[in-house]
Amino acid sequence: MAQTPEAKVKKVVVQQLKDVGAYYFYPVTGGYGGNGVPDVVGCYLGLFFAIECKAGRNKPTKLQEKNMQWIADAGGLTWVVNEENMRSVAETLRAAANA
């Protein structure tokens, strides 16, 4: 089965998280889970982060943007990753954790 463009982005993101030794998971949505939660949530060297993966020109929904803002307001790092910046996840985490 062929991967969707977003699945390809997620695969690259997850590999970088593994490479740096970050703790991460994919939140459950629907049912008891919440909607609008970023695709990948985790912690790296004490830094809470949340990543929304998108492909092409896709943008976060208003609810996703709201959740990302709540995370940022609480002191977490959150950003949107796509094909253009998907290879910079490890670098971004290292820089933020050492700031």
Where are these regions (language model features)?
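Catalytic phosphate/metal-binding cores of nucleic-acid and nucleotide-processing enzymes, i.e., regions
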Residues: 1-99
